[in-house]
């Protein structure tokens, strides 16, 4: 009986110590459909763009490749939680839901993926993004 409990405890601890998957390598990011990209883009255009285009108020700018690469290593769960609850960073504050209080959880989820999608496109093209 003690062996079983010890075995279950070890499995539990292994499961808890998983390192986050880099967003750029996550299956969800790689499998985003056009509909999901458009959903994320709509939140970007109406809410995220104001701060994350140029780093206003200390926000991470999609033009800062090194910063986005560092953020990507935190994994989706931590970044999504920061969006939902808000956060205080080194250079500024992001309010809960990035001020998109009418956004659904799904819209916010794809806005996180979209901003990394956009940052990737910006880095590949070496051009500034547009809001369409």
Residue positions per predicted region:
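Post-cleavage N-terminal segment of exported redox proteins
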Residues: 2-37, 114-132
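Processing junctions and N-termini across compartments
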Residues: 10, 42-45, 88, 97
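Disulfide-bonded cysteines in secreted/extracellular proteins and peptides
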Residues: 16, 48-51, 100-103
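Electrostatic cytochrome c docking/interface patches
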Residues: 20-42, 57-70
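Surface-exposed, polar/charged faces of alpha-helical domains
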Residues: 35, 39, 63-70, 74-77, ...
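Solvent-exposed, acidic/flexible segments
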Residues: 37, 41, 72, 101-108
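The canonical Cys-X-X-Cys-His
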Residues: 44-54, 83, 111-115
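Axial heme c-ligation environment in periplasmic c-type cytochrome domains
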Residues: 82-108, 115-118, 123-132
